Amino acid sequence: MPSVSLSTSKPTTARADVLILGIRGDEDKGELAETLDLLGFSGEKGQTTRFPSGGLAKAPVVIAVALPAEPTAEDLRRAAARAVRSVKNAATVAVALHPAGVDEVEAIAEGITLGSYRYDAYKSAPQGDAQRIELASAVILTPFARQTTATKAVERAATVAEAVNTARDWVNTPPGDLRPADFAESITAHVSSSLGGNEVKVSVWDDKRLAKERCGGILGVGRGSDSPPRLVTLTYEPADAVSHLALVGKGITFDSGGLSIKSGPGMSTMKIDMAGAAAVVAATVAIAQLGLPVRVTAYACIAENMPSGDATRPGDVLHMRNGSTVEVLNTDAEGRLVLADGLALAVEAEADHIVDVATLTGACVVALGERTSGILSSDEDFAGTVLASSRAAGESMWPLPIAEEMKASVHSSNVADLRQHNPKPYGGALFAAAFLREFVGEVPWAHLDIAGPSFNDGAAYDYTPNGGTGVGVRTLVRLASELAGVR
Ligand code: BES
Ligand code: ZN
Ligand code: ZN
């Protein structure tokens, strides 16, 4: 990850290998007008072009990036990332994107760190000519450089973007190398290496403890795997906490579908199914690093969903943590079962608000596309707060209703209190949320269905790499600062 700093230098005098220069329209082109025109740089938002500075600037290479006349923070986050991704073989960049304020400086810093992410843990080291110089440092050029609010914004950006990158790493790890015990251990190691003292406490329940604690949902899903399930709980309890936020994440390290097995292509990306747990853990660590005055209890509900001679069958009934019974009718709808126990624990912990994050349904992807997460909630005000946080963070989310008729359907099991799977194939994301709502009592709760945005199976764009995206982390950190009333 490059280190990011601030400077009041002018773009032409900044010392760096590459100058990234934002162009907001013809006036911004100045002496470069002819060069940019010859390169076919039309100024269409997001466009980039690269050329030697020819002595016009100290930096030997310029990357021009087109900006709108009045770029938003998200425009700048994307532009910074896009430009940084096109840097090849340079160690230092100076970034001149004309931030209008400190929020924009923060967005640029986030874009730099998010855009430089690469997952190469399993790539052999490049040989000879293929060896690349990594970007080591970036300096953002702004007149605000000497203001402490700007320095703080850059520090905050580093914390948040590194948390996003941590979540990406977990999602990208091959599922055979991140089975439930591995994931739990990796979370424990991450917490202790990221925080100095014991600001965040970690507790891990193994399968025996889960049985003692009557977590029948997590156990039922993990039953078919040789690698038994885990529940990892993180607690951050600052003395000045003004509110208690519980986060619950779906942590299916691999979703084969279980006995209701998926098709080959359907399961090929299912290592992503722990992206919700990755997001809540990474966000909790970031919230603690930032010292936000909000108590956070995060539950990573971790299991591997596999078929076997002893896997949970369609027709089986599970005894859940909150005392209710659930008839399983499709073992591929496993996320709601592990989340239900986490949600019940969050209610027991007397949280003021609960947010769960889950790659829950293909239906949500059908409804909102691959880049927008669904927000489903029991409380309109709280849903509004979450939506506002997602906007401020630059993550695309949109509310979906929990349609009235779903309640009766969730209660229509002939043998148990609840049924886990809707006999009708419509509104799958809504039914899943109606099921989860049964476990949150009266606590204001929002469910983020990130099935689409958690993974990018195409080429990298803006700050979104191929593979795990780390979606949810930025919204959760914003939400915590919103609830804490600080920035
Ligand atoms: N993990 C999947 C949901 C998913 C699908 C995530 C595509 C990311 C991309 C989930 O466990 C699942 O299999 N859901 C089923 C539910 C159905 C059986 C009611 C689905 O969406 O098909
Ligand atoms: Zn599934
Ligand atoms: Zn799943």
Feature names for model-found ranges:
Residues 167, 183-487:
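A generic structural signal for tightly packed, nonpolar segments enriched in small/aliphatic residues
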